[in-house]
């Protein structure tokens, strides 16, 4: 179990520690509470029979966050590029390949030897023979705890990062200034007056804005302004944005109180300037599409800016408030251990009923049956 941390602003907080804060609600929880109500409990860690969702590889998204928000140096320190077979055209892949290479060099070996044993023979007796398994093993030893990306992904990431930083609107947001320190994955943990634990993780906190990178996912191909608008609405990103605005306000309080953890001296000095020098800020999403050479998808970056106090900020705040009210009501009714359910009032179809079900017009059949008067009399 992760260590339970005190309220405060955290930099460089491990993902497992952030998500491991027992009972702390994040913005994704609020979106589920608003959109699914009681269904939130069933997908939460409170449900002992919860089924972990299948997650596709997230390394590309993590790497994009790192190279765009923290810079190339941070990306290269955190990620390692996997060996690519194309860079080792003469590598021995199969046992038969290794045997053939040893035979060419007149090296003696046991015919019944395992593949790994033959690789060791190559290391000692024929070091000029490249064994693919040995390349991978050496890479594993070298990479340590770093995450990995493929050679193709590394190239794509660098192209996308360059596109962001050279963008006429978004690029200047990331431009270095005296004392500027990149702030990525800013974690905020706090407690509401009624004891509800909260958490938020800001992709990047810049003086002029809070930024969030989002995947376009399976883009339908419709015009991007329409597609992105639908994504924001469907995924509850307006709620998330409003919650991030609230979290940043809390973060400013923690900065003033000295409740900042995990920051370097340079990061701490930079953070201390925010409350006075950046009292108001905007918000931007950077939607991206991962390139796919096979499907013919280009890397796409689609930035969206919103001012503090916008209409969607207001809508999102209302939804976040409603989500917390749902949480309070259900916790009071069911508690954390009993499954959350909902039984609606008895409804009727008849017109004028207080609780009415509304049928679609196409349910009607205009053709009378010969015996219908007798049948329904």
Language model regions located:
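Secondary-structure boundary elements
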Residues: 174-177, 206-212, 249-257
